[in-house]
Amino acid sequence: VIAANDSYEEGELYFNGAETSHYSETDWEKYREKNIAMIFQDFNIIENLTVLENVELALLRVEDKIKRRKTAEDLIAKVGLTAQKNRKGSKLSGGEKQRTVIARALAKDSPVILADEPTGNLDVKASKEVAALLKAVSKDKLVIVVTHNPEFFVEYATRRVTIFDGSVKEDKVIRKPLPKTSADKEEIKAGKWQNFKNTMHIGTLNYKSRPKFTAMM
């Protein structure tokens, strides 16, 4: 629902304090394009393209080819794949493929990154590396991880939400996000950011707080 890949019939999804239940299909498309970047379990990269070409696909809005290439290379460096940037997707390991997907998600420059089982197809070593990388990029993003492997993320998550049979069974703050302003501190102190029981409220405070990393299990 947060990714706008499915609709909802009960409750309300707020985004920056605004209701979304009245959104039309066009509204949802705009919302998704502007606000959401996805990381999938099955990598979802184009196997016959290089790492660089896969990341550049998310930068087609950048008309200047030189700037597009520089931005892509910077993002690839950020996820530690500079040495593999000219390697085709079919030649990458699982961990390298997921790093490519993370770089592509960052290229979209959306405020929210949704990671759907990002370690599901990875071994333990690669899973730990991807979890640490998602923590690193969460410093200026809201990262929501859906996972059946919480052990890889509990070290980094600021909030853990356990969902069973369509209901929230646990909503636990593991560690408080770090506020940037005194106003944020007052909101955190007042507990205004903790309500998740009946609605998913991705509010202004979520974007101001850093780091922001929610694991949903």
Roles of regions detected by a PLM:
Residues E56-R69, K78:
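ABC-type ATPase nucleotide-binding domains, specifically the catalytic core motifs of the NBD
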Residues G11-E19:
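Conserved ABC transporter NBD signature motif
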Residues K88-L92, E96-Q98:
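Conserved ABC ATPase signature
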Residues T20-A37, Q194, H201:
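ABC ATPase NBD coupling module
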Residues L81, K85, A105-L106:
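ABC ATPase C-loop
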Residues E33, R87, K108, K139:
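Conserved signature/switch motifs of ABC ATPase nucleotide-binding domains
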Residues I113-D116:
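Catalytic Walker B motif of ABC-type/P-loop ATPase nucleotide-binding domains
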Residues A3:
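Helix-to-loop junction immediately C-terminal to a conserved catalytic motif
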